[in-house]
Design a protein with these regions (language model features):
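Active-site-adjacent structural elements that line small-molecule/cofactor binding pockets in enzymes
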Residues: 1-287
Length: 287
């Protein structure tokens, strides 16, 4: 992002979703303020709590009360970036200065003066309570595996969002006149998240797909994937689901299906494609 920021002057710089267990809120704030300074105020920081398999298995941290931990993390991040005074915080998950230890910790604040006192935060979330937390505390929400036709499942979560709240949906886009071939690629992605990106007893991606009306298929996908039958798991992803979660097919078809996204609460598309021509095509349609 620092390199992209140095080569551009207008576009915003988004991080996608940084797992909050990977960085303390003070460390994340220092990095964000530096990037925002170098880009003259163009950073949008995406954050997310991840899941227990990653948090406990990779970062070696406990995973209790993720909503409360996220709330505390955001509060500290905001205070550091605001740079109004040395930061003191006494929470359940974070304490600044640390209680105990050598007893030498003291409240501190940034040396660098931010170009903005508030850097936009976008919360990656799938659970209804987590989405509601994002609508309360953040400038935006980054959903994935969401259908523009079924976003009413978040009606209550988004009921009190501010008028300028951003919803930046992650959408795979594949321009291909062979629709079945395009959807097969989407099915592999969706099937991997439903089947493998979480434990059998705790998988927020599977839960989200189930809440959108594909519970029976989600159960089958997870069962096949965990049995080592990945190809069968991917094939078990319904065409309807893969199609709704993506933009696939000819340019004319994609152009038609873009209308559903435009009519939904989504305000921005995070386009997933390695193809520059596809990005250019979508820019012409959306901008």
């Amino acid at each position: 992002l620092a390199w992209i920021g140095s080569q551009t002057s207008k576009i915003n710089l988004g991080t996608s979703i940084m797992q909050i267990s990977a960085r303390t809120p003070t460390s994340a704030a220092m990095t964000a303020v530096t990037l925002d300074y170098l880009s003259n105020g163009r950073l949008k920081l995406g954050i997310g709590v991840s899941g227990p398999q990653v948090v406990e298995g990779w970062y070696g941290q406990p995973y209790p009360k993720p909503l409360a931990r996220t709330r505390e993390w955001i509060e500290i991040f905001r205070r550091v970036v605001a740079r109004e005074e040395p930061v003191e915080f006494d929470g359940e998950h974070y304490q600044l200065p640390l209680q105990g230890g050598m007893g030498l910790g003291k409240p501190l604040k940034l040396i660098l003066h931010p170009v903005r006192s508030r850097i936009p935060l976008y919360l990656g979330a799938e659970g209804p309570k987590n989405v509601a937390l994002g609508a309360e505390l953040c400038e935006g929400w980054i959903p994935m595996l969401i259908s523009p036709y079924r976003m009413d499942i978040y009606k209550d979560s988004l009921a009190h969002r501010p008028p300028d709240f951003d919803i930046a949906a992650t959408v795979t886009v594949i321009v291909d006149d062979d629709l079945d071939r395009a959807l097969a690629r989407v099915k592999a992605f969706v099937g991997f998240y439903i089947g493998g990106m979480g434990a059998k007893s705790f998988n927020v991606h599977k839960d989200l797909v189930s809440r959108q009306g594909f519970g029976e298929a989600a159960d089958k996908i997870q069962e096949l994937f965990m049995a080592g039958r990945r190809d069968e798991a991917f094939a078990a992803v319904p065409d309807e689901l893969a199609d709704e979660l993506s933009l696939c097919g000819s340019k004319d078809r994609i152009r038609d299906r873009l209308q559903a996204w435009k009519e939904s609460p989504v305000t921005m598309l995070n386009v997933g494609t390695p193809d520059r021509d596809t990005l250019r095509f979508l820019a012409e349609e959306l901008l």
